[in-house]
Amino acid sequence: MTLSFITRWCDELPETYTALSPTPLNKARLIWHNAELANTLSIPSSLFKNGAGVWGGETLLPGMSPLAQVYSGHQFGVWAGQLGDGRGILLGEQQLADGTTMDWHLKGAGLTPYSRMGDGRAVLRSTIRESLASEAMHYLGIPTTRALSIVSSDSPVYRETVEPGAMLMRVAPSHLRFGHFEHFYYRREPEKVRQLADFAIRHYWSHLADDEDKYRLWFSDVVARTASLIAQWQTVGFAHGVMNTDNMSLLGLTLDYGPFGFLDDYEPGFICNHSDHQGRYSFDNQPAVALWNLQRLAQTLSPFVAVDALNEALDSYQQVLLTHYGQRMRQKLGFMTEQKEDNALLNELFSLMARERSDYTRTFRMLSLTEQHSAASPLRDEFIDRAAFDDWFARYRRRLQQDEVSDIERQQLMQSVNPALVLRNWLAQRAIEAAEKGDMTELHRLHEALRNPFSDRDDDYVSRPPDWGKRLEVSCSS
């Protein structure tokens, strides 16, 4: 089957990119590919049998028109000016059978005009982390970019140490970022900001294209998508680590996995990025940061969208976020209805977990085993202050009994939203260290496990992290 690529970005937004081809690595080799995703995208298996090929930037497929995008952004709350694809190249936009499209973006593809002081490369460590994280999030049901392939090489890349160079093929319906809009707003080119908005609406919000109120409705949906995404992050204990405006997806996807982390111990102020000295991107600050980023996007639209309309959309953010968050947390607790004491029960559980540094994922998974008419709970053994837990658990059981559903029905609901497995940093690190020694077994094994996060397991993937795996420091270096 021949893959079809179109050139919408290239044709319609000529001032937003530089056309260039990838720079291949030395002795590149394909070490992993996503067969399930490839099948979904109708990619012939033969493409994965011819060496690094397109996955390593050595060849292009017919119809591809590679380019590096330019954008700007606020980093850690400070205007950083022009940024752009410093090591990534958009190879093309695949036209799928249903009429939708999928960007093929090759990360680590070499120097671009936007590399600044960088070398245009990615290392094996970071490409493995992103591949694992994006697939983990996908199977958790959270909107995200996807990983299609990893290529390793003999090319040395210099970071804190010398690491093997690598490339990641990332796919997504669009790589439109808040930073694309900021770039032209701060260059005082509002007509180009409007072109970007029209492009987005035409291709991703086409049902609004002929609406005279399209910009307000479109921005309101961007706000809603962002609020929903952040609510989902918070419910699974995911910290992004570097929520700069240039890392914010217009479509509400999780984008640019760097120093991310899933909660081990429940620590509301968890900081996963060791460069985040002020805690701007701490776990509990993510909802506020996302709103701040949306405000920056709204500012770029103010030359052609009424400020009152923008503010009305921004004002809806909190309610949308709380609605999504509340619904999912009630499901995690096994509540079939909404009762006035629900928030108090959740907050008291969080307080108990924070005091005892309870494991976030294990706590909710074990809570899924609760039988409403039994005072016994396997979760009790996870707490030191048994009296405090017993007091909370007694009130929790009384609340469960109000819903009048069977234990089996409730447990099935809870186990469908409380994962047994998340991508803890130590699991990723173990796969990385093996891969750097040439053993890809753990990389493939972990990828396979992450496809079923809600299934019970009896291996160390669902155990508490070992001592060496706690508080692993992760930086933006990639």
UniProtKB/Swiss-Prot annotation:
Cofactor(s) in the UniProt record: Mg(2+); Mn(2+)
Top-level taxon of the source organism: Bacteria
Active site: D246
Record EC number: 2.7.7.-, 2.7.7.108
Keywords of this entry: ATP-binding, Magnesium, Manganese, Metal-binding, Nucleotide-binding, Nucleotidyltransferase, Transferase
Example GO molecular function: ATP binding
Catalytic activity from the UniProt record: L-seryl-[protein] + ATP = 3-O-(5'-adenylyl)-L-seryl-[protein] + diphosphate; L-threonyl-[protein] + ATP = 3-O-(5'-adenylyl)-L-threonyl-[protein] + diphosphate; L-tyrosyl-[protein] + ATP = O-(5'-adenylyl)-L-tyrosyl-[protein] + diphosphate; L-histidyl-[protein] + UTP = N(tele)-(5'-uridylyl)-L-histidyl-[protein] + diphosphate
Pfam families noted in UniProt: SelO
Positions annotated to bind ATP: G84, G86, R87, K107, D119, G120, R170, R177, D256
Enzyme class: transferase
Binding site for Mg(2+): N247, D256
Family: Belongs to the SELO family.
Described purpose of this protein according to its UniProt entry: Nucleotidyltransferase involved in the post-translational modification of proteins. It can catalyze the addition of adenosine monophosphate (AMP) or uridine monophosphate (UMP) to a protein, resulting in modifications known as AMPylation and UMPylation.
Matches recorded under HAMAP family: YdiU_SelO
Record-given protein name: Protein nucleotidyltransferase YdiU
